[in-house]
Amino acid sequence: GVEAVSDRIVDFAKNLADGDMSKFEKLKGAIEKGFGMARKSLGGKLPDISQATYAATMKKLDAWKNGTGAKTGTEKTE
């Protein structure tokens, strides 16, 4: 569902960043671009579930950036 997919997207971004928050904007931009490409290929509008996934992903990315995000469901803990 929406939560699982958005968790995976954010976890992927976190793993790519490897703790380097200077990569945040580039990663967020790449995610936005990916959703934009999907939107374009679908005639300019994403299905409702994809719109919800985009919104959840952006919210989780912002929480990560601001240090206010809880761990995602798939995030590794040490």
Regions found by a protein language model. Give the residues of each.
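Type III/flagellar secretion export determinants
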Residues: 1-78
